[in-house]
Curated annotation (Swiss-Prot):
This is Valine--tRNA ligase. Transmembrane segments: none annotated. ValRS has two distinct active sites: one for aminoacylation and one for editing. The misactivated threonine is translocated from the active site to the editing site. Its EC number is 6.1.1.9. One of its GO terms (cellular component) is cytosol.
């Protein structure tokens, strides 16, 4: 008796099986065979598993399990990223919730970092526990945290080497600044959001008594205005930054302003004189064609300022309040503003003298105001002075921090940078030479664009949590870089009397993440490298990641790995699309459309789902709308699907497109697939009680040969789809074989043999059932590890297999069974399937009870049909409940019958005693209409020049053959219709 449960319930065995796998050490690299390494993009230690993680990790796990079963020495390197900004925010929020009055600042640097480590010890492994629930077969003993001692040593080594090579420098540049976090952030952490704003037009008076002839024209070129003006009109969306303007700019070929080149304007509200400069950057058609230039608070203006040597005027404090510039300088170094000095020359002098950007007096009314309060006051003062010309609505692209939601400020600060030109050139060579392959290949274009337009990389962050920059300063500001302070003192001969303080900044997390391919393998410590298999597992085989971090992570790993090890980090880069909801919308907390993969796996009630989606919203007013939409979409919550159903869904959706729409209905369908597999296994087990077989079956029936040939084909397709990273086609191929070929057809076709008097045929059929099922379970295992393991444990012993787990079984190979002589059997069974389908459709349409036997008449056969009927008569009779089969001669009169056509063979079921004639006429009319529709489809394709000229010749020929078959069927159906 089988001990397999009567129904499929994934919650009853998935967690149990995973615990067994992990305890047995099945995921640990074997050290034998060709190495196959996969790198997990390290998720934030603060994070929880989301659909993007589940999507990529499912594909990675399938690749790892597939190669493990093929005998590869598999290493799936996992770990977590320390996530500087995110972690500081989480711990700061937890401190507030504790209600003890402790804050980041009150604890101080050392105290706060201690709190972070406490939090990490308590909650830092959440995402790894969730990954286990998904079924990830990674070696957890190798799990690495980017702040662990080994990767931290790698970070210091990398920084020191690049600094000594002249690739790392400290300088003053414009960066993305979050005024809430008070740190620079990367472009990836900035979301550009379209918002409603305003465009203000302001009069800037010309200095030195200069005026010009202003002329305006209508759309037809007719002059509409001519007047003498002593001012320019400048349009801006940020009037508060005019306090930091150091020029206004016109296009050098703009005829309206040719007389004003090198003139000066008087900056409103400040009285300072700034130059009118010319630059091709100006769009003459936008507004008045006059642009204000604020190099310290706009990235484009910064580039203009570099070209024209303009001063850099910083307006803001670190929390985006208007600054008192005197705070930036010692009293004896504060620059004296003289309206007669050319600001561009003064800037050169000032930089040489202090190494600082230019500072100046700001009207005291604005000092200390938040930037938006300052905006209101600036506009009020401009209105009072008659300088505000126009205010009109304007759509803006507003840069907001993805964590704080605050508007990001382009901000001028002292930061650490990496020179990227030489590194990027080499990184591009490695890809274009084919040493690294992108899949799909079109992503090379994105990679190339970024590498050819690269800028120096800002690597410093104004945080406490992270890898502190290994640089020390003496009281004179001299910088020393080394692995630690002792090394710095020894290297530079600095005694104990020389006070040193370490740079307070930390490195951004991408700096440590770029070292992931080799820091996890022990670099730079020789002993650790030997222990962790540096020489064996680098380069890794494939990186599975999203297109959004091709530049931020993929490119940097390529450059860093080459720079520090002389190798590529990986051979293949498989770029996945972005998971969206069923309507194509990005999943986000604010939209209330996030699906938690664990809720899909284990289920969730509607009340808990609503609570999860409405808790902690940045916009609480959205809660009611989100609750309403959630209750409408999931009135009963989300049912238990199990990890296998989710994994198979993910594989089926993994096209090579940019966006992937996740439909929960697909997951329910694939849960049914797992259930179908479960029930088919129960059938096989119940019909093979006491059986013990070994080796490859020796088929006695055509059905066995057919299924073995189909198995061989499915196996070959499986290998091809893995090689090409076509998980969608892989899922489609396996689904088709498992559901249709095995569960629907072979299980059905096996029944006549199992119930036959021929003991040899019955035995071989039992062997084939077990053999094909066991092979199918191995084919499916990388995608659906849990259900296949649970079923395989029951099936394997009946084939003499005694190993403990399917996960270490060999993966099926094409040619495991020699099917080269099975062509006739394949054709016979395909014909049999057509016969069964046609006759079952007739029985269904006539409402003939399944148990009632019918007579079958055959007519208009080909030379192959009679021998086939003779060979397959017992199967036909068993499957179709036939009383008998009779042949009619060509042209012989037939009784009123229900008809179907298979190839050129006419199938007739006499109607006497079965149905009334009116019902049969209706059925035939319906069938004729269906076949006419199929003929129309074929004619549509064959009538298309595009299809005929561009489709492969075999496909076109197949379509012509289909048209011929449908036409033959239509002729037979019309003849039968005419008879009744």
């Amino acid at each position: 008796m089988t001990t397999l449960a009567s129904s499929y319930d994934p919650s009853s065995f998935e967690s149990r099986l995973y615990a067994q796998w992990e305890a047995a050490g099945y995921f640990v690299p074997s050290g034998k065979g060709e190495p196959y390494t996969v790198l997990l993009p390290p998720p934030n230690v603060t994070g929880t598993l989301h659909m993007g993680h589940a999507f990529q990790q499912t594909l990675m796990d399938a690749l790892v399990r597939y190669h493990r079963m093929r005998g590869y020495d598999t290493l799936w390197q996992v770990g977590t990223d320390h996530a500087g900004i995110a972690t500081e925010m989480v711990v700061s929020r937890n401190l507030a919730l504790e209600g003890k009055g402790q804050t980041r600042d009150s604890l101080g640097r050392e105290g706060f970092i201690a709190k972070v480590w406490e939090w990490k010890a308590e909650s830092g492994d959440t995402i790894e526990r969730q990954m286990r629930r998904l079924g990830t077969s990674s070696d957890w003993s190798r799990s690495t945290f980017t702040m662990d001692p080994q990767p931290s040593a790698a970070v210091n080594e990398a920084f020191v080497r690049w600094y000594e090579q002249g690739l790392i420098y400290r300088g003053q540049r414009l960066v993305n600044w979050d005024p809430v976090l008070k740190t620079a952030i990367s472009d990836l952490e900035v979301e550009n959001v379209e918002e409603d704003g305003f465009l203000w037009s302001i009069r800037y008076p010309l200095a030195d008594g200069v005026s010009y002839e202003h002329v305006e024209h209508d759309a037809d070129g007719n002059e509409t205005l001519r007047e003498t003006r002593d001012y320019l009109v400048v349009a801006t969306t940020r009037p508060e930054t005019m306090l930091g303007d150091t020029a206004v700019m016109v296009h050098p070929e703009d005829a309206r302003y040719l007389t004003l080149h090198d003139a000066r304007i008087v900056l409103p509200l400040t009285g300072r004189h700034v130059p009118v400069i010319t630059d091709d950057y100006v769009d003459r058609a936008f507004g008045t064609g006059v642009v204000k230039v604020t190099p310290a608070h706009d990235f484009n203006d910064y580039q203009v300022g570099e070209r024209h040597n303009l001063p850099l005027v910083n307006l803001f404090t670190v929390d985006a309040k208007i600054i008192d510039p005197r705070e930036q300088y010692p009293d004896d170094e504060y620059p004296v503003v003289d309206q007669g000095i050319d600001w561009r020359e003064l800037n050169q002098v000032q930089r040489r003298r202090t190494g600082q950007h230019f500072a100046y007096s700001i009207p005291s009314a604005y000092v200390g105001l938040d930037r938006y309060e300052a905006r209101k006051l600036v506009l009020a003062h401009l209105e009072d002075e008659g300088r505000l010309v126009e205010t009109k609505p304007h759509k803006l692209q507003v840069p907001r921090g993805d964590r704080t939601g605050q508007v990001i400020e382009p901000y001028l600060t002292d930061q650490w940078f990496v020179k990227m030109d030489a590194l990027a050139k080499r990184g591009l060579e490695l890809v274009e030479s084919g040493q690294i392959k992108f899949v799909p290949p079109n992503w090379i274009n994105t990679y190339r664009h970024w590498m050819e337009n690269i800028q120096d990389w800002c690597i410093s962050r104004q945080l406490w949590w992270g890898h502190r920059i290994p640089a020390w300063f003496d009281e004179a500001g001299t910088c020393y870089v080394g692995h630690d302070e002792a090394e710095v003192r020894a290297k530079h001969g600095l005694g104990a009397d020389v006070a040193l303080h370490q740079d307070s900044d930390v490195l951004e997390t991408w700096f440590s993440s770029q070292l992931w391919p080799f820091s996890t393998l022990g670099w730079p410590d020789a002993q650790a490298m030997a222990e962790r298999g540096f020489a064996r597992y680098l380069p890794s085989s494939v990186l599975v990641t999203g297109f959004d971090i091709i530049f931020f992570w993929v490119a940097r790993m390529i450059m860093a790995t080459d720079s520090f090890t002389g190798q590529v980090p990986f051979r293949d880069v498989y770029i996945t699309g972005l998971i969206r909801d069923a309507q194509g919308q990005k999943m986000s907390k604010s939209k209330g459309n996030v699906l938690d993969p664990l809720d899909i796996i284990d289920g969730i009630s509607i009340e808990d789902l609503v609570a999860k989606r409405t808790h902690g919203l940045m916009q609480p007013r959205m809660a009611e709308k989100i609750e309403k939409a959630t209750r409408k979409e999931f009135p009963d919550g989300i049912i238990v699907h199990g990890a296998d159903a989710l994994r198979f869904t993910i594989a089926a959706l993994a096209t090579h497109g940019r966006d992937i729409k996740f439909d929960l209905g697909r997951a329910e369908g694939y849960k049914n697939f797992c259930n179908k597999l479960w029930n088919a296994t129960r059938f096989v087990l119940m019909n093979t009680e006491g059986a013990r077989f070994t080796g490859v079956p020796q088929p006695r029936t055509e059905a066995e040969k057919w299924i073995l040939a189909r198995l061989d084909k499915a196996t070959a397709e499986t290998h091809a789809h893995y090689a090409n990273y076509r998980f969608d086609l892989l899922a489609q191929s396996l689904y088709e074989f498992a559901w249709n070929a095995f569960c629907d057809w072979f299980v059905e076709l096996a029944k006549p043999a199992l119930n036959n008097q021929d003991a040899d045929a019955a035995a071989s059929t039992r062997h084939t059932l077990l053999y094909v099922l066991e092979s199918l379970l191995r084919l499916l295992h990388p995608l659906t590890p849990f259900v296949t393991e649970e079923l395989w444990q029951q099936v394997a012993p009946r084939l003499g297999i005694t190993t403990a787990t399917i996960s270490l079984q060999s993966f099926p190979q094409p040619g495991d069974v020699d099917t080269s002589s099975y062509a006739t059997a394949e054709a016979d069974v395909e014909w049999l399937k057509s016969m069964v389908s046609a006759l079952r459709r007739v029985r269904s349409e006539l409402n003939v009870p399944p148990s009632k036997q019918v007579r079958l008449l055959l007519q208009a056969d080909t030379a192959d049909d009679r021998p086939r009927v003779a060979r397959l008569a017992s199967q036909l009779s068993f499957l179709l409940k036939l009383e008998r089969i009779d042949w009619l001669d060509a042209g012989q009169d037939t009784p009123p019958s229900a008809a179907a056509i298979v190839g050129e063979l006419t199938l007739l079921v006499p109607l006497e005693g079965l149905v009334d004639m009116d019902a049969e006429r209706t059925r035939l009319d319906k069938e004729i209409k269906r076949v006419e529709g199929e003929i129309a489809k074929c004619n549509g394709k064959l009538g298309s020049a595009t299809f005929v000229q561009n489709a492969p010749a075999a496909v076109v020929e197949q379509e012509r053959a289909r048209l011929n078959d449908w036409t033959t069927q239509l002729t037979g159906l019309r003849e039968q219709r005419a008879k009744i």
